[in-house]
Amino acid sequence: MSTKKIIIDPITRIEGHLRIEVEIDENNVVTEAWASGQLFRGIETILKGRDPRDSGLIAQRICGVCTNVHYRASISAVEAAYGIEIPHNAEIIRNLVTLSLFVQDHIVHYYHLHSLDFVDITSALSADCAQAAEDAQIWCEHPYRNSDGHLEAIKEKLEGFVKAGRLGLFANGYWGHETYRLSPEENLVHMNHYLEALRIQRELSKAVAIFAGKTPHPQNLVVGGVTSVADMLNPQRLNDFLFIIKETRDFIERAYIPDMLMIVNAYRDSIKEGEGRAVGNFMCCGGYRFGKQQQLFENGVIKGHNFENIEPFDPSKITEEASRSWYENDAPLSPYDGETTPFYTDLNEDGSLKTEGKYTWVKAPRYDGNVMEVGPLARMIVGYVKNSPVIRPYMERFMKRSHMELIDFSTTIGRNAARAVEAQICCDYLFDTMSDLIENIKYYDETTWTKYVFEELPSEARGAGIFEVPRGVLGHFVR
């Protein structure tokens, strides 16, 4: 059997630091695949010997998209090491910022990173705008910005891009390919929401900045709490935040969820065939408290799609595997004992990866020796299986409308659907989280920082900050 190797370097949709090599057979089926992180970060090396209170500001430079979560996890790891408990208001403000990032990231991930794998922009140019407006009502009684006139304006804008030869980021699509399933009218509806999502994500950045100071790379976290005191006590700032979240919720309910229902319907056969299904190991660490005793996400571990058996999450079972990574130590180690000593072995003479040895700068995390899937799909499945009073009602509603079963979410389309459902949940529960803050302020609880004397803290300590974040589970371990 003859094989062909394809190399894609860089994968531009994830900031350009990933290389993929695949081998395909004569039927164009992928038989082997290797992923290689091509950038040495070295954040651990940079942090060694520094004041632990600075760890968050430095660690968040790992990524310009998900900066807040690295900032928070690093700060929380230091707090855990020193046994510092932050005030409830500080936890609320941290949750407001992080959950806003969840919603923004999910909208960007679907519309601006993934949707054009399903949506043919050139097909939208032949759409009947009146029919498009009517088709949108199949999935939502009152679709988002759905007038004939507005859709005509969107169509004219797209036509202008094409006629002027200024497709820009749309220039390299496989437009017209037979695997696109949407009608011209459905493509136009999607492109309408694609462009609207650009505005929504900009507004969500403003919401994050209200409490975080700025984004990316916010500045509001310190060991022991937050610095957003003036913003927390300013009614106008609170109203500005809520206004953006209300507008975002409207977009999710009248655009994002209906668009996912449309995609599920169009690609139902690929769902039933299990396209994109992985090994079925799901892991969640849980978290995000609101109200008295409730939390947004459940913790749990499911293996092999066995939804009848769910284990509690145990962070001590996490290890980092480096046998294929460009580091000296090959053994799987606890993150507390992890080593980041580079050992670069280069590529083959023809420029391909040395797939029999080391070929990436990225370590491979394992849970009890197993590969695990984390992120929206894992959280929605674990929450559903554990009968979460938060997650299960949203999942059941989407499953009823989409005619999906739980196993159907463990597919490429299903992951996108899970992300949309989670965006809706996070957006709704931002209001509950804000209510907790307002309730505390009403009863004169304005505490945002736990006082401590740094010089009196232990000279040796270790701690971990492990969180659910938009695209998975994030752990920062400090010693």
Question: What positions do the PLM features span?
Answer:
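Active-site bordering "gate/hinge" segments
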Residues: 1-473
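A translation/RNA-centric and nucleic-acid-associated enzymatic feature enriched
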Residues: 476-478
